[in-house]
Swiss-Prot record:
Residues 15-92 form the GIY-YIG domain. The keyword GTP-binding does not apply. Belongs to the UvrC family. The gene is uvrC. NCBIfam families: uvrC. This is UvrABC system protein C. One of its GO terms (biological process) is nucleotide-excision repair. Pfam families: GIY-YIG (PF01541), HHH_5 (PF14520), UVR (PF02151), UvrC_RNaseH (PF22920), UvrC_RNaseH_dom (PF08459).
C-alpha cells in the first residue's frame, strides 16, 4: 500500500509525457521510466496488484519525482540520460566494455597495428570486436606480415629486425613517406572489411614470382599466408552482400521476462552474438524496455558503434536513432529480414531453456519440499528448520540450526547455540535436555522479536527428540508448529520420517520415503547439512575451550592475561611459536611470558 505522501502526490500527476524517478527510503534513485502519460503510468504502480520484479520495486519505493517534456521522443532521450546518470538498480545494468579484443591502426606519425581491449576516441581505426583472442592475434600477425607499417619502438638510427624480415617500413632509421603508410592502411582496411580477393591475387602473384626467382623459402611463406586466408577468413559464412558494419537486435517476451539477442555483422559475416535476459520491471511496454536496453548498450565505454542498427517491427526507428546517434532500420525482406527472425528465434530458445532449467531445478528444490509436506499430510510451507546436537562424552555441548527455504539452504538463517545445561554423559535424558533448551531459546526469541516461525521442524532423531520439542512449543510457548523426526534404520541410514501429534490425538507413525524420490534426497541433504554444521561448531568450541583450559593451568596467567593471548594469537600453535618479545607485546610481563614458554 502506498504511503500518504505518495497518495497525495498521485493526485497531482499531469497527463503529459515525461520521465519518473522512483526513490528508496534514502532518496536514492532505484528506477527510471518514461511514459506518454505520466498520470496513468505512475498510478499503475500503486493502484493495482503487482507481481515479480515490479512487486519488488514497488515495495522499495518511498518517493518519486517526475520530469515533464513535450513529447514521447524527448521522454525517451531524457530516460537514457537519467539511467546513465543514476545507474538505478531496477533498470538494466550492462557490464562496461565488451571483454573482446579489437585490432587498432594507431593515429600516429608512424602508425602501427596492435591488439587492444580499450577503444579511445583518438581518431585511430578500430576493427572488431573479435570473439576469440587467438583468432584476433592470428589476424594481426597476418596483417603485420602482409601489410607492414611500424613494428619497432621508433627511430634508433639503424634498421630493426622486423625491417630485415619485411614486416616494418623502416621508421627506425629513415623517414617513411606518409603516402606509403596511407597505401598500406588502405589495404588493411579493405582486408578487414572483407575484401580479400585483391589480397589473394597479390599474394598468388608474389608466390609465383618468388618460385620463378628460386626464392623457395619466401614462396613457402607466401603459400602459408594464402592458406591462412582460405582456412580462416574464407571459411566464415558470408551472410550479407555488402560490408556495412551492422548490429541486429531482436527480443522475445514470456512470463514477465525479456530475452534479447544481438548479432554483430562485420566483414559481411556474423562475427559473434550476445545474449541478455532480465525480468521486466514494466510489463506493459516491453518495446520501451527493449529500446532502453539498446540505448544503454551503446552508452557503454569502449563500445565501437556500427554503421547501422537493425531492429524488428514496432520499434520507433527515429526515436532510437536520435538516442544512440546511429542509423536505425527495420528490414522488410531478404537476408537481413531472415537474420532478424533468426535473432528472435534464438532469443526465444534462450528464454525457453532458462524456464526449463528453472522447472528442473524447482523439482529438486521446491518440488522436493512439497513431497515432504505431502508425505506428512501437511499444506505446503516455505520454511523448514532442523536441529542437531554435538558433544564429546558430554563435554562442550552445542546445538546447531539450519534453515531450508523452498528446498534450498537459507544460510543467513543458520544459528549456533552453546548449551548451558550440565551434561555428564550421553543418554536419552541428555538429548531431551539439549532439545528442550535449544527449542526454548530459539522460539522464545522469535516470539519476542516478532519474527517468522517455520512451517515445519525436523529433528535429527526419533520420538524422544520430537516429543521434547513439541512439549516446549505447546506447553511453554503456546506455539503450534508441526514437528517430525528423521529416523535412521539399523544400518544408520535415514529412510523414514516420524510424525504424529499427540496433542491432537494423532499417534506417532513411521512414514517411509521413496529412496528414489526428490523428497528423500532433500531429507537426507537437510540431515547431512545440520550434522555438518553442528560438528563443525563443536570442533571450534572444543578447540577454544581446550586452549582456555591449557592457559588457565599456567601459573601467573589469569583471566585478563588469557584474554590478551587469545585476542592476539587465537590458537595454541601460534602462542607456542611466539617469542618472549611477542608475548610481552601482547601485554604479558616478562615473568608471565617466561612461564608461558616453559609450560607450552
Amino acid at each position: 500500500m502506498a504511503s500518504q505522501l505518495i497518495e497525495n502526490k498521485l493526485k497531482l500527476l499531469p497527463e503529459k509525457a515525461g520521465c519518473y524517478l522512483m526513490k528508496d527510503v534514502n532518496g536514492k534513485v532505484i528506477y527510471v521510466g518514461k511514459s506518454k502519460n505520466l498520470k496513468n503510468r505512475v498510478r499503475s504502480y500503486f493502484k493495482s496488484s503487482q507481481e515479480g520484479r515490479r512487486a519488488e520495486l514497488v515495495k522499495n519505493i518511498a518517493d518519486y519525482d517526475i520530469i515533464v517534456v513535450d513529447s514521447d521522443k524527448e521522454a525517451f532521450l531524457l530516460e537514457v540520460t537519467l539511467i546513465k546518470k543514476y545507474q538505478p538498480y531496477y533498470n538494466v545494468a550492462l557490464k562496461s566494455g565488451t571483454g573482446y579484443p579489437y585490432i587498432e591502426i594507431t593515429n600516429e606519425k608512424n602508425p602501427q597495428t596492435r591488439l587492444t581491449s580499450i577503444v579511445y576516441k583518438d581518431k585511430g581505426y578500430y576493427f572488431g570486436p573479435y570473439p576469440n583472442v587467438y583468432a584476433a592475434s592470428a589476424t594481426l600477425k597476418f596483417i603485420q606480415k602482409v601489410f607492414p607499417l611500424r613494428r619497432c619502438s621508433g627511430y634508433t638510427g639503424r634498421p630493426c629486425l622486423y625491417y630485415h624480415m619485411g614486416q616494418c617500413l623502416g621508421s627506425c632509421f629513415k623517414e617513411v613517406p606518409q603516402s606509403e603508410y596511407d597505401e598500406q592502411i588502405k589495404k588493411i582496411k579493405r582486408f578487414l572489411n572483407g575484401d580479400i580477393q585483391e589480397v589473394k591475387k597479390d599474394l598468388t602473384n608474389k608466390m609465383l614470382q618468388a618460385s620463378a626467382d628460386l626464392e623457395f623459402e619466401r614462396a613457402g611463406e607466401l603459400r602459408d599466408q594464402l592458406k591462412y586466408i582460405e582456412e580462416t577468413v574464407e571459411k566464415q559464412k558470408i551472410i550479407s552482400n555488402d560490408h556495412t558494419q551492422r548490429d541486429i537486435f531482436n527480443y522475445y517476451v514470456d512470463r514477465s521476462w525479456i530475452s534479447i539477442q544481438v548479432f554483430f555483422l562485420r566483414q559481411a559475416k556474423l562475427l559473434r552474438r550476445e545474449s541478455h535476459m532480465f525480468p521486466l520491471t514494466d510489463e506493459t511496454d516491453p518495446e520501451d524496455e527493449f529500446m532502453s536496453f539498446i540505448a544503454q548498450f551503446y552508452a557503454q565505454k569502449n563500445r565501437v558503434n556500427p554503421r547501422e542498427v537493425l531492429v524488428p517491427k514496432g520499434i520507433d526507428q527515429d526515436e532510437l536513432a536520435a538516442a544512440i546517434g546511429i542509423k536505425v532500420r527495420t528490414p522488410q525482406r531478404g537476408q537481413k529480414a531472415s537474420l532478424m527472425e533468426m535473432a528472435r528465434e534464438n532469443a526465444q530458445l534462450k528464454l525457453d531453456d532458462k524456464f526449463r532449467l528453472l522447472e528442473l531445478g524447482q523439482r529438486k528444490t521446491k518440488g522436493a519440499q512439497e513431497e515432504i509436506f505431502k508425505a506428512l499430510g501437511l499444506p505446503y510451507g516455505s520454511y523448514i528448520e532442523s536441529f542437531d546436537h554435538s558433544h564429546i562424552q558430554g563435554a562442550d555441548p552445542v546445538s546447531a540450526l539450519v534453515v531450508f527455504k523452498d528446498g534450498e539452504p537459507f544460510k543467513t538463517g543458520y544459528r549456533k547455540f552453546k548449551l548451558k545445561g550440565e551434561v555428564e554423559h550421553q543418554n536419552s535424558a541428555d538429548e531431551v535436555g539439549n532439545t528442550r533448551e535449544v527449542v526454548r531459546r530459539r522460539y522464545s526469541r522469535l516470539l519476542k522479536e516478532h519474527e517468522r516461525m517455520p512451517d515445519l521442524i525436523l529433528m535429527d532423531g526419533g520420538q524422544i527428540q520430537v516429543e521434547a520439542c513439541e512439549d516446549v512449543l505447546r506447553n511453554e510457548l503456546n506455539l503450534d508448529i508441526p514437528v517430525a523426526g528423521m529416523v535412521k534404520d539399523d544400518k544408520h541410514r535415514t529412510n523414514h520420517l516420524l510424525y504424529g501429534d499427540p496433542f491432537k490425538g494423532q499417534p506417532f507413525k513411521l512414514i517411509p520415503m521413496d529412496p528414489k524420490s526428490e523428497g528423500f534426497y532433500l531429507m537426507t541433504r537437510i540431515q547431512d547439512e545440520v550434522h555438518r554444521f553442528a560438528i563443525t561448531f563443536h570442533r571450534q568450541t572444543h578447540a577454544k575451550n581446550s586452549l582456555v583450559s591449557r592457559l588457565d593451568s599456567i601459573k601467573g596467567i589469569g583471566p585478563k592475561s588469557r584474554t590478551k593471548l587469545l585476542r592476539e594469537f587465537g590458537s595454541l600453535k601460534k602462542i607456542k611459536e611466539a617469542s618472549i618479545d611477542d608475548l610481552r607485546k601482547a601485554g604479558l610481563t616478562l615473568t608471565q611470558a617466561q612461564a608461558v614458554k616453559i609450560s607450552l
